[in-house]
């Protein structure tokens, strides 16, 4: 489960007990069936602005979320999530990174498909795995994706997401 607030605070939960020996990829953590639910709400009031659900038909949490945006919001979406697992069973997930690209109206869908394929290219992956998060991080990733393309890409000028969880340590490890 992941929760991202309107102020870009985010938290994500995963039960370490559900991670078996030798799990090396995110898709192996999830089962064969499920539902993707996305709710957009106004932070100060909590009023739901929009919500949607779709069947998790691809059996991969990342692909199912991209599929949700395509069928629910009619937006071509490319997602990439990289999870670095640690050998410590008490803290099995060392770091997690994600990128989401969405095609704007009148986007060249062939170029967008090319960007989708590049999301896990070695040059992009090396930037993500380096773990350096400064003000140039998003620009570096965007440049690695688009440096040789004739296209117009923009970074969303909003605030950077910050991991913040109000849960106590005891409830987080339970």
Residue locations for each model-derived region?
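Generic hydrophobic, helix-prone segments enriched in Leu/Val/Ile
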Residues: 2-3, 12, 36-39, 112-119, ...
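Non-catalytic alpha-helical scaffold/packing segments enriched in small hydrophobic residues
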Residues: 64, 100, 137-140
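Generic recognition of cysteine residues
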Residues: 8, 96, 107, 151-153, ...
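Cys/His-clustered metal-coordination modules, chiefly Zn-binding fingers
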Residues: 116-174
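Active-site environment of non-heme Fe oxygenases that use a 2-His-1-carboxylate facial triad
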Residues: 69-71, 76-133
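General detector of N-terminal leader/presequence modules that precede the first folded domain
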Residues: 1-89
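Generic structural "secondary-structure junction" signal
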Residues: 56, 103-106, 155-157
């Amino acid at each position: 489960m992941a929760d991202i607030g309107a102020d870009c605070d985010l938290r994500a939960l995963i039960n370490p007990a559900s991670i078996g020996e030798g799990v090396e990829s995110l898709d192996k953590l999830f089962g064969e069936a499920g539902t993707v639910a996305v709710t957009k709400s106004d932070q100060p009031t909590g009023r739901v602005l929009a919500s949607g659900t779709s069947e998790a038909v691809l059996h991969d949490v990342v692909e199912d979320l991209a599929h949700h945006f395509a069928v629910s919001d009619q937006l071509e979406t490319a997602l990439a999530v990289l999870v670095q697992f640690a050998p410590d069973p008490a803290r099995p997930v060392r770091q997690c990174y994600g990128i989401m690209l969405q095609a704007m109206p009148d986007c060249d869908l062939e170029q967008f498909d090319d960007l989708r394929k590049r999301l896990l290219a070695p040059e992009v992956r090396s930037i993500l795995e380096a773990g350096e998060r400064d003000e140039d991080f998003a620009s570096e990733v965007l440049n690695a994706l688009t440096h040789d393309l004739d296209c117009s890409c923009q970074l969303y000028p909003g605030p950077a997401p910050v991991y913040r969880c109000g849960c106590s340590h005891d409830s987080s490890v339970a």
